[in-house]
Every structure is written in C-alpha cells, then in structure tokens.
Amino acid sequence: MKELALGYLRQKAFSDRDKALMSLKLLTENAVGIGDHTTEDFYKNLDEALDLLVDAEDRIEVLGKYYGR
C-alpha cells in the first residue's frame, strides 16, 4: 500500500511538472491567442504555471529526500 501511495504522489508530481513546463512553453513561444485574453489573464496564466512548476519540483525533491528514488 505504501508503494502505491508513493507511486501515485511521484507520478502526480512529475505530471504536474510536465503540465507546467508545457504551459510555460506555450505561453512564451506560441502566445498567438493572447488577443482573445487580456494581458492580465496572460500574466495570471504565467504565474499559475510557474507556481505549479515550483510546487511540483518541491514535491519531487521532498519525496526523493524522505522516500528515496
């Protein structure tokens, strides 16, 4: 049970990291859809993606520190 729980937490953290990286890449390299949104929405999306990335990286680090792998 412990391994299943830790596996879930690891996979969720890696998935969130990939999601954040993809969002940041889309926002910084392919921001063609900005015209549909305000710049405030754009900044909010950037902040949310970075927050998700930082959170995911922290979770990956903590899981590695306390549970290995």
State each model region's role.
Residues M1-R69:
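Extended, charge-rich alpha-helical interface modules
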